[in-house]
Every structure is written in C-alpha cells, then in structure tokens.
Design a protein with these regions (language model features):
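Positively charged, amphipathic and often flexible ligand-engagement surfaces
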Residues: 1-281
Length: 281
C-alpha cells in the first residue's frame, strides 16, 4: 500500500490525485465528467541536478502524451525549479521550450507556476521571452507580493496570460503583504487591471467575494474569463460555478507531495476550508 493511501494521508489525499500518472489521469477524467477542466501538476521543485530535472522532464512529457491520447480537457502547470532554473537559466529555457513545443502540438496550455521570491524575476522574464513564440502559455502571479500589480501590468502590456492566486509561500514584510485584508485588496487591484487591460486570464480563488466580483466584472467588461480552484477544496462551489463558467481544478500528483501539502496546511484560511471539505465529504 502506498503511503498516500494510509490513514495519515487523509488530508493530502484531499488535494493530491495520486502518486502516479495513471491515478492522476483517472481523477482528471472524473473531474472532466463534471464539466470542469484540470490543471495537471506533476509535483517537483528545488531540483539541483540535471539528472533529477531530466527525470521530471520525462514525467512531464509522458503527462502531455497521456492528456492527448486520453482526451483530457485541461492544461499543465510546471515549476521553473522543477525544469532546471537552479541549474542555469539557459537550461531552464531549453526545457521550457521543449514542453511548450510538444504542448502546442497537442493544443495544451502550459502554466508557469510561481515559486520563492528570488525566482520571480527570471520566471517572468523567461515567460515573456517565450510567449512571443508560443501563445499556449501563461504565468502565475501571487497577489500577496507587493510587486505583483506592476508584474500584472507588464504581462498584460505584452498580451500575456495571468493566473492570479493569493500565494502560498511565506515572505517577509519587506516584499509581501502580511495582513490578509491587504492581500485581498491587492488581489482586487490586480484583478481589476486584468479586466481592464487583458483578454485572457484566470482568477484562481476560493473566496466568495472575489468570485462574485469577478462574475459581475465579466458582465461589466463583456468578457469571459477562466476560474481556478484546488482539488478537494470547496468542490460544491466549483461545481456550481462550472455550470455557467470555465472552471479549472488544480490537480497535483506524484511522490513529492509533502512540500506542497505543508504549504497548504501552513495557511490557516486554507486549512479551515479543507477541514470543512473533509468533514462534508
């Protein structure tokens, strides 16, 4: 029995699709059957050797092949440090372009996830560099960072695509908002700018007020945007939104689930939502 099937992994199982691609594809099919798309994420980060990066690249290429052959409706998310950024920027760019090329042939969008603050500039720069050639890619922006509104403005200016999230990483007060009200307000500022200046973007939030404002803004600006939520978090709300909106469920899988789970558990607001989701089933 795999560790993810053990009693101690009850909470992780709420978020994680499984430890292997087969289980992840099965879960993706189930989600697709509910008229929801998926953002599939093979878990991995902070890789310091080419050997580990190449192992992850093999998994990501298999993921794209399986999504195509099994007709999975959705996109994938990859982390820069999973695909070689710590080794070198040029190595990361080479791997990112390989992923984009294959994904483009399959009609699959690739999201660049955002990581620790020191990787933000290189992530955005690389995204904008390859966005010129590949239109099937977007980048994640964390509203808790004080710099994010300027990043959103820059990306929108280049017709890029943003997936706006609150952010799960811990940052000092010099670079990030600490009060949840400030994070909320910055999220709204970034979202308003996207509605005013961008054609395609995703609002990834479990917050009722943010979702309501986004739906009302669709009517105000005559736009159809995408919404995103985490697997196993407020699933009934996601299903309700999916009745009339483009809902995308973030679907992580793989053996490296610990860091991802710890980040989620470190957020009290997320933890309350997840505990409620587990109790309610």
């Amino acid at each position: 029995m795999s560790v993810i099937d053990s009693f101690g992994m009850l909470i992780a199982k709420k978020w994680i699709a499984g430890e292997d691609l087969q289980h992840a594809i099965q879960e993706a099919k189930r989600i697709n059957s509910h008229k929801e798309s998926v953002i599939m994420n093979y878990l991995g980060e902070d890789l310091k050797s080419k050997k580990l990066v190449e192992q992850n690249m093999d998994q990501l290429m298999q993921l794209l092949d399986q999504m195509h052959s099994k007709k999975i409706k959705g996109s994938i998310a990859v982390k820069p440090t999973q695909t070689g950024l710590i080794v070198s920027t040029s190595y990361f760019e080479k791997n990112y372009s390989m992923i984009l090329a294959k994904a483009q042939r399959y009609g699959i969008t690739v999201w660049l996830d955002m990581e620790q603050y020191r990787f933000v500039p290189s992530t955005i720069n690389t995204y904008l560099k390859f966005h010129k050639q590949y239109k099937n890619t977007g980048v994640c922006i964390q509203a808790k960072l004080k710099r994010s509104l300027k990043d959103v403005e820059r990306i929108a200016k280049h017709n890029g695509m943003v997936r706006l999230v609150k952010g799960a990483y811990k940052y000092p007060s010099t670079i990030a908002f600490q009060d949840k009200r400030d994070v909320y307000n910055n999220y709204l500022r970034c979202m308003e700018y996207l509605f005013s200046h961008a054609d395609k973007f995703m609002i990834a939030s479990h917050d009722d007020k943010i979702i309501k404002i986004a739906i009302n803004s669709e009517k105000k600006y005559h736009k159809r945007i995408a919404f995103g939520m985490l697997k196993g978090v407020r699933s009934s709300l996601a299903a309700k939104i999916a009745e009339s909106e483009d809902m995308n469920i973030y679907l992580p899988y793989g053996e490296e689930w610990i860091k991802y789970s710890m980040r989620r558990l470190s957020e009290w607001e997320h933890t309350k939502i997840i505990i409620r989701s587990i109790i309610q089933g």
